[in-house]
UniProtKB/Swiss-Prot annotation:
The keyword Translocase does not apply. Pathway: Carbohydrate metabolism; D-tagatose 6-phosphate degradation; D-glyceraldehyde 3-phosphate and glycerone phosphate from D-tagatose 6-phosphate: step 1/2. One of its GO terms (molecular function) is ATP binding. InterPro entries: Carboh/pur_kinase_PfkB_CS, LacC, PfkB_dom, Ribokinase-like, Tagatose/fructose_Pkinase. It comes from Streptococcus pneumoniae serotype 19F (strain G54). This is Tagatose-6-phosphate kinase.
């Protein structure tokens, strides 16, 4: 089983409009509300793929109850309740544009943060792989993910970590390393304080920087140009076919689902990389975020090429 961790989930509300009118009333007919957050996108895709998944994280108030109720019944859930209220994230879809209004979310009390560590430690006993995704809520220290990684390492469970900014920097500077990280070029540039291109020789050098020492897998998305990856001392380039992109949002989460599944099933490097890329591409072909149509899985899988570089 795979444990997904979403520390700052949200109720994602979608308001489709023909036109967004400013300083007046906009009436919405077709409203959708879903359990949101990067980790919950990972959860949905793993469930649709057919892997056993347990979802955890922090929820609070009536919105927290709503969120848990709106996670697929096939998914096991064991969230930790806090005093603060789970946030709303609103997307206004008008024409070809999308305007987002994102609430900051609750401030987590220090005691709640400590108690979640104990909660997380108990959940580790029943899972084989951990996937941690998204931002940290206010109130938790910037190195909180390093504490989760430390507990998972002590339990012998591999960790796929998908976060960015100061939270990722804190983990990289910690002695407790995740098994997998998946930064993109922009995030690599931010971490290193210099521009990083998609040139393969440059990426090889970058991923051997001391900052990334001790991390078994580093998987870098190159968008339509596929993926560059480092596993131990071996480098890979994944070439992907052109596809019709409907909605790319959440494709990185689907990639995390594929990586986690590959670790769970102890797949070869090539199998793990292909699965991760295919699930990301399947997500991009769907209107709904964090959703894949498995009927198209094998046809895409057969088109991907992994080469050692």
């Amino acid at each position: 089983m795979i444990l997904t961790v979403t520390m700052n989930p949200s109720i994602d509300i979608s308001y489709p409009l023909d036109e967004l009118k400013i300083d007046t009333v906009n009436r919405v007919v077709d409203v959708t509300k879903t359990a949101g957050g990067k980790g919950l996108n990972v959860t949905r895709v793993l469930s649709e793929f057919g892997d056993s998944v347990l979802a955890t994280g922090l929820v609070g108030g009536k919105l927290g109850e709503f969120l848990v109720e709106h996670i697929d019944n096939q998914v096991k859930k064991d969230f930790f309740s806090i005093k603060g209220e789970t946030r709303n994230c609103i997307a206004i879809l008008h024409g070809d544009n999308q305007t987002e209004v994102l609430e900051k979310g609750p401030e987590v009390l220090e005691q709640e943060g400590q108690e979640f560590l104990e909660h997380f430690k108990k959940l580790l006993e029943s899972v084989e792989v951990v996937a941690i995704s998204g931002s940290l809520p206010a109130g938790l220290p910037v190195d909180y993910y390093a504490s989760l990684v430390e507990l998972a390492n002590q339990a012998g469970k591999p960790v796929v970590l998908d976060c960015s900014g100061a939270a990722l920097q804190a983990v990289l500077e910690s002695p407790h390393k995740p098994t997998v990280i998946k930064p993109n070029n922009e995030e690599l540039s931010q971490l290193l304080g210099r521009e990083v291109s998609e040139d393969l020789d440059e990426l090889k050098e970058v991923l051997q920087e001391p900052l990334f020492a001790g991390i078994e897998w580093i998987i870098v998305s190159l968008g339509a140009n596929g993926t560059f990856a480092k596993h131990g001392d071996t480098f890979y380039k994944v070439d992907i076919p052109r596809i019709q992109v409907v909605n790319p949002v959440g494709s990185g989460d689907x990639t995390v689902a594929g990586i986690s599944s590959g670790l769970l099933h102890k797949e070869s490097d090539a199998e793990l990389l292909i699965k991760a890329n295919v699930l990301g591409m399947l997500n991009a072909q769907e209107k709904m975020t964090g959703h894949v149509n498995m009927a198209n899985y094998q046809a895409l899988y057969d088109q991907l090429i992994v080469k050692e570089v």
